[in-house]
Amino acid sequence: MRRPKSSHVRMEPVAPRSHNTMPMLDQFRSNHPETSKIEGVSSLDTALKVFWNNQREQLGNFAGQTHLPLSRVRKILKSDPEVKKISCDVPALFSKACEYFILEVTLRAWMHTQSCTRETIRRCDIFQAVKNSGTYDFLIDRVPFGPHCVTHQGVQPPAEMILPDMNVPIDMDQIEEENMMEERSVGFDLNCDLQ
């Protein structure tokens, strides 16, 4: 039997295709188009209410499928030396709670991104989402924030300017004399003949 050339072998993906966004966020966006152009804090509250109502509806249809790997969640839970045994329901429950956390922080960061008229979530958007939330403010020390986050809106950080003291009296005659001395000290004359 002859084997096909390696260039003709079609490789099947090991894992299912990954998405740019989580499917629940896509459903939220498609079910509630009025939240796509939201501005201000009150609209963030509206978006969060719609989001959590949608999550409650989906929770009724929850069949145990999670987007985070349960084996990894179980390993993280077992990494604590005080944990001896883990019930079989705990990884699924913890995974679902992590999904809700990720979705809400992402929604808050997305709202901040849209308020800055951008279409890409950046680290500073996540920082602002955590900072502006009373629930997640304990994470402020864990989310990195640097000076690069200030320039994303086109606003440069203030530069240090050293200005002369404006209250000192200036003698204009002395400045004119210094300028005249500099002009005389030039070492050549343009009108002289070079031979």
Swiss-Prot record:
Provide the residue span(s) of the region labelled Disordered.
1-24
Q: According to the lineage, what is the superkingdom?
A: Eukaryota
The cross-references to Gene3D superfamilies, in alphabetical order and at most eight, read: Histone, subunit A (1.10.20.10)
- Which lineage do the record's taxonomy fields give for this organism? Eukaryota, Viridiplantae, Streptophyta, Embryophyta, Tracheophyta
Its localization reads: Nucleus
Subunit note: Heterotrimeric transcription factor composed of three components, NF-YA, NF-YB and NF-YC. NF-YB and NF-YC must interact and dimerize for NF-YA association and DNA binding.
**Its family?**
Belongs to the NFYC/HAP5 subunit family.
Pfam families given in the database record:
CBFD_NFYB_HMF
Q: What's a GO cellular component annotated to this UniProt protein? A: nucleus
Its protein name is Nuclear transcription factor Y subunit C-10
Species, as recorded: Arabidopsis thaliana
Predominant location category: nucleus
| Annotated GO MF terms | DNA binding; DNA-binding transcription factor activity; protein heterodimerization activity
| PANTHER family tied to this protein | HISTONE-LIKE TRANSCRIPTION FACTOR CCAAT-RELATED (PTHR10252), NUCLEAR TRANSCRIPTION FACTOR Y SUBUNIT C-10 (PTHR10252:SF124)
Query: What functional role does this protein have?
Result: Stimulates the transcription of various genes by recognizing and binding to a CCAAT motif in promoters.
- What keywords tag this UniProt record? Activator, DNA-binding, Nucleus, Transcription, Transcription regulation
Q: Which residues form the signal peptide?
A: none
